[in-house]
Every structure is written in structure tokens, then in C-alpha cells.
């Protein structure tokens, strides 16, 4: 197993490698087959690894994936690619309004972890909030609680604040689906949409920039879903019924339906892949 780390230094990478190093020492057979490497963007080095690979697991943007896939590999090499994806949250306004204070606090903390912790940069972080059974009082109750919690936990970087304001101005100029925009402070920007359009996934927020829409029915969402849609985080929603509706609609996207707070919980099933199965070779004897 050869893992190429990002060429930039991040303290999280060092911490994770240290932890993995401690654990992997208990399993010598795995340790001697595993290496973490770092090198500048260099197709010659990557090509040398690709030529010997049985599996290429590629994380990155669409352009990065296309670049790696273009490098020669053995005829039986399996590619598992994790490309650009888009995620959203589906909240029930009446459920938010009826929630006890402790339930609301838990919801807000979970939502914060799904969004602000990664500045919405993760592919599974919701960019747009869809409200079913929309209730203005429920919506305001939610956002007031999010604002109060984020003020205590989130440090808004100057560059992020500038980017958010620039994005808001660009939306006001070019987004024909924009209905209204709300910002009490620089912490949270809310852009309400008057309709869902086929280019929904082009609208992405970062650092507390959220799109919102009052959903008439699930079919309205399904009409704009593409293969780019990954995770739907839910609150107050019948997840089993929603999952059945997604399957029945034979959508090309929406691979994960999880509670708010579980957006980042990666497992052996990701992006619609069963990773253990796809990374295994099966030997069958009759």
C-alpha cells in the first residue's frame, strides 16, 4: 500500500501518520507492505507507481482524477475514483419547531460539525438546506441557535470573510434563482432560492455560506439530482421512506442518507462503492 500525501504540510497529516505508525507496528506484515510518501506534483513518479499498481484509489478533483487515469497501468488494474461531489441537508421545519431545547442543541452541534469544522470544503458537507414542511418560526429558531453556537466555536478568518462577501455579491448579480439574502453578521450568510435549477451543484458555499430552499416535495429535488450528488443529511425526516423514494426514482446520485452530524463518518461504503469488495481479489474453487 503506497499512499501519496499532499505536498503541503498540514499538522493533521502529521498527527494522523503518528497515530497510524503506533497502531501499524502491532501488525508487522501490514507495516512492511505500507508506505506513506510525499513528493511534488510529478507525473513521472506517479506513472512509476501506476505501472505496478493492482488498484489505484484516486481522491481529488475531476481534473486530478483524469490526469491519473491517463497514466498507463496494467490491464487488470482496478480504479476506484472519488471525484467532486455535492451534498445537502434535508430538514423538517415543523420538527425543528417542536424539538426540545436539548434536541435543538444537539442538532445544532451536529450541524456545526458537518459544516463549520471543515469550512464546508468536504464533499459530504451540505451546501444547501432544503426545508420540508417549511415553517418560518422553525427556520429562524434553527439559525438563531446555529449563530449562537458558532459564535462560541468558530474563528472566521479574514480571507474567508472576504471570499464570502465576494460570493454573495456575485450571487446577487448572476443567480437568477436568488430570492433573498440574509446576513446578520459575517458569520452566517443565507441565500434563499426561489426555485431549484439543474445547475444547483454549481452553487457552493464555504465558511458559513448556505443556500436554502422551501421544498414542495421530494420529487422536486429528484428532478435536479445528477451523479454528482453524494450525501443527504436529515433531521425530522423519515429516512427509510426517503431512501425508498430515492431507489424507486432510480437516481444517478445520492449515495448516502444519514442523520445530521454523520456527514463526515466515512466507512467501508463510500461514494456508492463497497471498498472491501472492490479492493479484494476473489479466488473461487469448484
Predicted regions mapped to residue ranges:
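NAD(P)-dependent aldehyde/semialdehyde dehydrogenase
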Residues: 109, 118-233, 240-284
Amino acid at each position: 500500500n503506497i499512499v501519496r500525501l499532499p505536498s503541503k504540510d498540514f499538522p493533521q497529516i502529521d498527527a494522523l501518520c503518528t497515530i497510524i505508525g503506533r497502531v501499524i507496528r502491532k501488525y508487522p506484515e501490514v507495516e512492511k507492505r505500507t508506505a506513506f510518501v510525499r513528493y511534488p506534483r510529478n507525473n513521472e513518479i506517479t506513472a512509476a507507481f501506476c505501472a505496478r499498481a493492482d488498484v489505484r484509489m484516486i481522491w481529488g478533483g475531476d481534473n486530478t482524477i483524469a490526469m491519473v487515469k491517463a497514466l498507463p497501468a496494467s490491464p487488470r488494474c482496478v480504479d476506484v475514483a472519488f471525484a467532486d461531489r455535492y451534498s445537502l441537508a434535508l430538514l423538517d421545519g415543523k420538527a425543528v419547531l417542536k424539538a426540545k431545547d436539548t434536541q435543538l442543541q444537539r442538532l445544532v452541534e451536529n450541524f456545526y460539525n458537518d459544516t463549520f469544522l471543515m469550512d464546508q470544503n468536504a464533499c459530504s458537507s451540505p451546501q444547501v438546506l432544503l426545508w420540508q414542511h417549511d415553517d418560518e418560526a422553525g427556520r429562524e429558531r434553527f439559525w438563531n441557535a446555529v449563530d449562537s453556537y458558532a459564535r462560541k466555536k468558530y474563528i472566521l478568518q479574514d480571507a474567508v470573510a472576504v471570499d464570502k462577501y465576494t460570493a454573495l455579491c456575485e450571487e446577487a448579480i448572476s443567480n437568477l434563482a436568488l430570492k433573498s439574502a440574509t446576513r446578520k453578521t459575517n458569520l452566517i450568510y443565507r441565500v434563499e432560492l426561489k426555485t431549484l435549477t439543474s445547475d444547483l451543484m454549481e452553487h457552493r458555499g464555504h465558511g458559513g455560506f448556505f443556500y436554502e430552499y422551501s421544498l414542495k416535495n421530494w420529487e422536486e429535488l429528484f428532478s435536479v439530482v445528477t451523479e454528482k450528488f453524494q450525501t443527504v443529511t436529515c433531521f425530522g425526516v423519515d429516512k427509510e421512506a426517503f431512501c425508498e423514494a430515492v431507489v424507486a426514482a432510480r437516481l444517478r446520485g445520492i449515495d448516502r442518507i444519514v442523520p445530521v452530524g454523520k456527514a463526515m463518518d466515512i466507512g467501508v461504503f463510500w461514494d456508492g462503492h463497497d471498498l472491501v469488495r472492490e479492493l479484494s481479489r476473489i479466488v473461487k474453487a469448484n
